[in-house]
Amino acid sequence: MSKLVLATGNQGKVKEMASLLADFGFDVVAQSDFNVSSVAETGTTFIENAIIKARHAAKETGLPAIADDSGLEVDFLQGAPGIYSARFAGEDATDQQNLEKLLADMEGVPAEQRTARFHCVLVMMRHENDPTPLVCHGSWEGSILTQAQGENGFGYDPVFWVPEDQCASAQLESPRKKELSHRGKALQKLFAALKDA
């Protein structure tokens, strides 16, 4: 099994990504196990931020690193929260505060205007100076509910309506979420790229 550093401090992402990557034969180690310092996400796109995080983790650990930059894009909000999804309600906002801000911003918006999607960009760098990092993107179409539903998942999962299963993302069991989610789709692409490499 290949060891891989997961460049995130988000424990929800660590749990979900470790489970997904284990399916592909990777032994995932969280960057917190190496005391990797935080790095400013100064990019203006999901791709730029994922590269910044993967390069930083690879540099500090000496191991291959994978970084995820993901977020929710709401059409009514002209794509917000986007790359600012984790800090939509402020720099140190909790998942609950971000979710509450989203619901407040969407209050009174009719169902047909509540379309949204999750995006996930995964970047894998074999080392800090990798000139050809693997970059994979996945998206997941849905809409924004008027109130939270479900106990599973993290972030915006309780308000993200999944049309395929007629429930909130937070109501999905883990195997089904892996199959449908933006992160699961991006990881499938990453695994296919690794097999071809």
Curated annotation (Swiss-Prot):
Cofactor(s) the protein needs: Mg(2+)
Database matches in SUPFAM superfamilies: ITPase-like
Record-level GO cellular component terms: cytosol
One GO BP annotation of this record: purine nucleoside triphosphate catabolic process
Catalytic center residues: 69
Cofactor note: Binds 1 Mg(2+) ion per subunit.
InterPro entries from the UniProt entry: dITP/XTP_pyrophosphatase, ITPase-like_fam, RdgB/HAM1
Binding site residues for substrate: 8-13, 70, 154-157, 177, 182-183
Keyword Nucleotide-binding: yes
GO MF annotation terms: dITP diphosphatase activity; ITP diphosphatase activity; metal ion binding; nucleotide binding; ribonucleoside triphosphate phosphatase activity; XTP diphosphatase activity
Binding annotation for Mg(2+): 69
Catalytic activity: XTP + H2O = XMP + diphosphate + H(+); dITP + H2O = dIMP + diphosphate + H(+); ITP + H2O = IMP + diphosphate + H(+)
Enzyme class: hydrolase
Alphabetical list of CDD domains matching this protein: HAM1 (cd00515)
Keyword list, A-Z: Hydrolase, Magnesium, Metal-binding, Nucleotide metabolism, Nucleotide-binding
Function of the molecule: Pyrophosphatase that catalyzes the hydrolysis of nucleoside triphosphates to their monophosphate derivatives, with a high preference for the non-canonical purine nucleotides XTP (xanthosine triphosphate), dITP (deoxyinosine triphosphate) and ITP. Seems to function as a house-cleaning enzyme that removes non-canonical purine nucleotides from the nucleotide pool, thus preventing their incorporation into DNA/RNA and avoiding chromosomal lesions.
Quaternary structure and partners: Homodimer.
Protein name: dITP/XTP pyrophosphatase
Source species of the chain: Photobacterium profundum (strain SS9)
Lineage summary: Bacteria, Pseudomonadati, Pseudomonadota, Gammaproteobacteria, Vibrionales
